[in-house]
UniProtKB/Swiss-Prot annotation:
Topological type in the membrane: Multi-pass membrane protein
Protein's cellular compartments: Cell inner membrane
Keyword Transferase: no
Major localisation: membrane
Catalysed reaction, written as an equation: fluoride(in) = fluoride(out)
Stated name of the protein: Fluoride-specific ion channel FluC 1
Keyword Cell membrane: yes
Superkingdom in the source lineage: Bacteria
Binding site for Na(+): 58, 61
Source organism (scientific name): Brucella suis biovar 1 (strain 1330)
Any Pfam family hit: DUF302
Length: 254
């Protein structure tokens, strides 16, 4: 039954190399890569290994049925077997390349169409990410300058990129700055001590694979929910929301 079904779906290999099916496979893999990249952009995932893994897995599933059919039908003759072997090899390589090309196309499409821009977006993890017009280093400098001008303390800066370099590893520019107002922070910790785990405020400037720079901070309102803060913290949280928003907007803008 399986062989009869494959015979219906696959052209006889004795007719020559199944180019039409190969083209269909490549197109399917390209579209898969495009959709995968757009979805990754939508959910704000920058894990390249995960994206590629999803794409490759889908690509393999797309052409596996064709490859299996080719192998089954190859039993007809040696020439058919050679055609099947060539098809499987070309299909695997072309499928991988098509998936990668589709992922690149999806990323470019998202940039051009602004379909899923992460600009000023709050995602489920409580992170607010805005695109910065400046380099990572300059963005962090602007965070520090604005925070100080608003009476906040700048506690420390951590250059993750430099740390990676010292460890002999590669990492795009990534820098963390910690700042805040002890008066507001103390009120929050008097309410729930565990919020000290997320204080002072942290801002991370980072460069993505396309060279764009982003500034990510914790959403103070989300932190209030995470630590189940009470009414006594409302004023301090509102002040933190305003202060963090002002600093972020200035640091990432003109």
């Amino acid at each position: 039954m399986t062989r009869e079904f494959i015979m219906l779906m696959m052209p006889p290999l004795t007719d020559g190399f199944p180019l039409d099916i190969l083209v269909a496979n490549v197109v399917a893999c390209f579209l898969l890569g495009t959709v995968t990249a757009l979805y990754a952009r939508k959910i704000h995932s920058r894990d390249v290994h995960t994206i590629i893994g999803m794409g490759m897995m889908g690509g393999v599933s797309t052409f596996s049925s064709f490859a299996y059919g080719s192998v089954v039908l190859a039993s007809a003759s040696m020439s058919a077997f050679l055609i099947a072997a060539a098809y499987v090899t070309v299909s695997v390589v072309a499928g991988y390349v098509a998936v990668l090309a589709g992922m690149k196309f999806g990323e470019k499409s998202a940039d051009i169409l602004h379909r899923y821009p992460p600009m000023a977006s709050i995602i489920d993890s409580g992170l607010v990410t805005v695109e910065s017009r400046h380099s990572v280093a300059e963005t962090i400098e602007r965070v520090a300058a604005k925070a100080k001008s608003m009476g906040m303390n700048v506690f420390t800066r951590v250059d993750h990129g430099a740390g990676a370099k010292e460890a002999g590893l590669g990492l795009p520019p990534t820098e963390l700055i910690i700042f805040g107002n002890p008066q507001n922070g103390t009120v929050l910790m008097q309410d729930k001590r565990t919020i000290g785990l997320d204080l002072p405020i942290r801002a991370l400037a980072w460069e993505d694979g396309s060279g764009k720079v982003w500034l990510t901070v914790n959403d103070p309102a989300w932190l209030a929910q995470r630590h189940s803060l009470g009414l006594s913290s409302d004023v301090a949280i509102k002040a933190m929301v305003t202060g963090t928003g002002t600093v972020t907007k200035y640091a990432a803008g003109d």
